[in-house]
């Protein structure tokens, strides 16, 4: 006997969360809970404004349509990426095919005063991997901050994300302020320039490795081993079904590229599932999941060690 519930939710964000020049005041999304006999599974559907191709309203319509079909015995996954991801997670949980083991390590997202960051990063236990968003301020300032951190913490490796913010000139201004001796400790810089060709040229000219992120979701993207490209950053909410995520990880690994499972600012429920996916598909790589601190609450499932209050499903708006 099949049954299903669909919930809609909204989480207040901390002030100062800006995506593509838009302030994100709340994170809005949906949960689906699927029950099949004694088995149940949850999934999160939360399109990311400015990044997802679908709106929340479009995702909601696609989800409700799919759930009604599933209750009648249909099984084809929806095509809308965030819905395909959430539904496939719920189905995998119900079927017992999403492993419980999780990788709760998170490359911390560094913001704030650089001097404070040096102290925090120096005290980090284990493998020191951290992430910095660049391209929000002046490229020269970004270069100076990155150089300062790499100089002050000799065993630190940084992941940088520019979200295609720079012109070739600005990218070069950034690189000019990073000591060539430290550049090998930049694990990768995600999409420094507006075009792939400009990003490739940046990698060639500076020796700073780059990673593809937005490119993975473009129709003409092909996985290939290229000089200067070290990684791909896979955001499942933007990618689609678990099977598609798995195919992309496999394609990257076959070419010797690092695959990083990364957050699209999901709620704690979605983040804990991403931690499980990372432990399953990319066990050697610290995932990029340090986004819960941007929110004011957790929901349904807790992230281990987080002091944020957790809202139960009883408090969510039920649509079905």
Swiss-Prot record:
SMART domains linked = MR_MLE
Q: Which InterPro entries match?
A: Enolase-like_C_sf (IPR036849), Enolase-like_N (IPR029017), Enolase_C-like (IPR029065), Mandelate_racemase_C (IPR013342), OSB_synthase_MenC1 (IPR010196), OSBS_N (IPR041338)
An example of a GO molecular function for this protein is: O-succinylbenzoate synthase activity
Q: Which pathway is recorded for this entry?
A: Quinol/quinone metabolism; 1,4-dihydroxy-2-naphthoate biosynthesis; 1,4-dihydroxy-2-naphthoate from chorismate: step 4/7; Quinol/quinone metabolism; menaquinone biosynthesis
Q: Which UniProt keywords apply?
A: Lyase, Magnesium, Menaquinone biosynthesis, Metal-binding
> What reaction(s) does this enzyme catalyze?
(1R,6R)-6-hydroxy-2-succinyl-cyclohexa-2,4-diene-1-carboxylate = 2-succinylbenzoate + H2O
Q: Where are the transmembrane segments?
A: none
**Record-listed E.C. numbers:** 4.2.1.113
Where does the source fall among the domains of life? Bacteria
- Which positions in this protein are listed as binding Mg(2+)? 161, 190, 213
Q: Name one GO biological process term.
A: menaquinone biosynthetic process
Q: What is the top EC class of this enzyme, as a single word?
A: lyase
**Cysteine-cysteine disulfides:** none
Instruction: Report the Pfam families cross-referenced here.
Output: MenC_N, MR_MLE_C
- Residues in the active site? 133, 235
Cofactor(s) listed in the protein's UniProt record: a divalent metal cation
Which CDD domains has this protein been placed in?
OSBS
Name the family the entry cites.
Belongs to the mandelate racemase/muconate lactonizing enzyme family. MenC type 1 subfamily.
Q: What does this protein do?
A: Converts 2-succinyl-6-hydroxy-2,4-cyclohexadiene-1-carboxylate (SHCHC) to 2-succinylbenzoate (OSB).
Entry protein name? o-succinylbenzoate synthase
List the source organism.
Citrobacter koseri (strain ATCC BAA-895 / CDC 4225-83 / SGSC4696)
Its ancestry begins with:
Bacteria, Pseudomonadati, Pseudomonadota, Gammaproteobacteria, Enterobacterales
Q: Quick one: which gene encodes this?
A: menC
């Amino acid at each position: 006997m099949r049954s299903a519930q669909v919930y809609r939710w909204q989480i207040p964000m901390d002030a100062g969360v800006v995506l593509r020049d838009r302030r994100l005041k709340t994170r809005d999304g949906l949960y689906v809970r699927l029950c099949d006999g004694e088995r149940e599974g949850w999934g999160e559907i939360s399109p990311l404004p400015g990044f997802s191709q679908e709106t929340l309203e479009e995702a909601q319509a696609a989800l409700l349509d799919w759930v009604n079909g599933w209750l009648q015995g249909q099984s084809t996954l929806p095509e809308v990426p965030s819905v395909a991801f959430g539904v496939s997670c719920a189905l995998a949980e119900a079927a017992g095919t999403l492993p419980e083991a999780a990788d709760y390590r998170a490359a911390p997202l560094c913001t704030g005063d650089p001097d404070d960051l040096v102290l925090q990063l120096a005290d980090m236990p284990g493998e020191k991997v951290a992430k910095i968003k660049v391209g929000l301020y002046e490229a020269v300032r970004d270069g100076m901050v990155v150089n300062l951190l790499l100089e002050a913490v000799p065993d630190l490796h940084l992941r940088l994300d520019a979200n295609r913010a720079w012109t070739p000139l600005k990218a070069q201004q950034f690189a000019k302020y990073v000591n060539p001796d430290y550049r090998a400790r930049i694990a990768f810089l995600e999409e420094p320039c507006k075009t792939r060709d400009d990003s490739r040229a940046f990698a060639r000219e500076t020796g700073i490795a780059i990673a593809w992120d937005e490119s993975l979701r473009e129709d003409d993207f092909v996985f290939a081993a290229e000089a200067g490209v070290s990684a791909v950053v896979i955001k499942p909410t933007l990618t689609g079904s678990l099977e598609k995520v798995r195919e992309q990880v496999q394609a990257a690994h076959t070419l010797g590229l690092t695959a990083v499972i990364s957050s699209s600012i999901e709620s704690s429920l979605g983040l804990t599932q991403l931690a499980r996916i990372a432990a399953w598909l990319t066990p050697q790589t610290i995932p990029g999941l340090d986004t819960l601190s941007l929110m004011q609450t957790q929901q349904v499932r807790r992230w281990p060690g987080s002091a944020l209050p957790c809202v139960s499903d009883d408090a969510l708006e039920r649509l079905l």
